[in-house]
Amino acid sequence: MKLLRSLALLAVATAGLSIHALQAEPLKIGYSDWPGYTILEVAKQKGWFKDAGLDVELVWFDYLPSLDAFSAGKIDAVCVVGTDALVNGANGAKSKIIALLDYSDGSDMIVGMPGINSIKDLKGKKVGIELTLVEHLLLLKALEANGMKQADVELVNTPTNETPQTLASGKVAAIGAWYPNSGQALKNVPGSKPLFTSADAKGLIFDVLAVNPTSYAQHKEEWTKIVGIYYKAVDYLYDPKTHDDAVKIMAAKVGADPADYAKNVPGTHFLTLKEAKAAFTKGDDLMSVYGSMTIGNQFNLDNSVYKESQKPASYLTPAIVNSL
């Protein structure tokens, strides 16, 4: 009896340790230098996750490595372009898109060298972009708007964080990049200019919070709080009384000058909770994430990013946003 009682107590103690260990494991969110992701740093610095009783670890990455980490199961969630969430899913890492963070409103750019004054001037010339990512999609939109097609330019596959140096080298006539890389490219090459930006195609590029389905199912209460805190950070940025503090925090995270960063903030349309609810409404146009991601899915298919069409509606999970 004494042995049985000891074994029973050991089992209870072990179970208790397991539960504690499970609770002690933080929810890991991958984020990178896009402003719509970097704003999470505001929530971290202000202690809002801890105030809500949450154990959240924000893990800083370059953009593509953050997608790889999510695919490998090293993080619970990732801040990502909606189109790229489909790529991860097609490769086996399905996700639940539980929050819409922003849409690009000018910070994604096709930047031309001095003497290149329009998209039409790029005919027959080299353009440095990271193939199959959002700048590739933006370039195709720019070409289409100017009566051109991809075959009219020569694409040079260039990691986005290397585009400022590539433009400065003079080896290409233009590059495609998002902020802060787009801003750095303009600064590195006097006389360079934006030829086409995401402000010319609002809603083409939605950024989202994509969560591992198992983590979502097991921690829905925590994810609900996290989503609420994200929109609290957006409100903090938009509030004139706290705007400068938010910008200072975000700029410091990416090593940018706060004044320069502030000038570029409008290029990202951070979604308020109300706007996120509206964008989660089903529709065919770009201002509905359903319509936007349908276009992104077709882009991925056309460029052989994956072979089997993905269904955006199977990823989009508006329940948390609609409950707030």
Sequence positions of predicted segments:
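Pocket-lining segment of extracytoplasmic ligand-binding domains
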Residues: G82-D84, V156, E162-P258
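Predominant activation on well-ordered alpha-helical scaffold segments within soluble catalytic domains
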Residues: E41, L86, L140, G183-L186, ...
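Sec/Tat signal peptide C-region and signal peptidase I cleavage site
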Residues: L17-A24
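Hinge/cleft segment of the Venus flytrap/periplasmic-binding protein
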Residues: G296-Q298, D302-L324
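Short, glycine-/small- and polar/acidic-enriched structural segments
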Residues: E25-T166, A173-Y179, L195, G203
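Secondary-structure end/capping motifs
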Residues: A217-V305
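Hydrophobic helical h-region of N-terminal Sec-dependent signal peptides
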Residues: A8-L17
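Bacterial N-terminal signal peptides that target proteins for export
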Residues: M1-A8
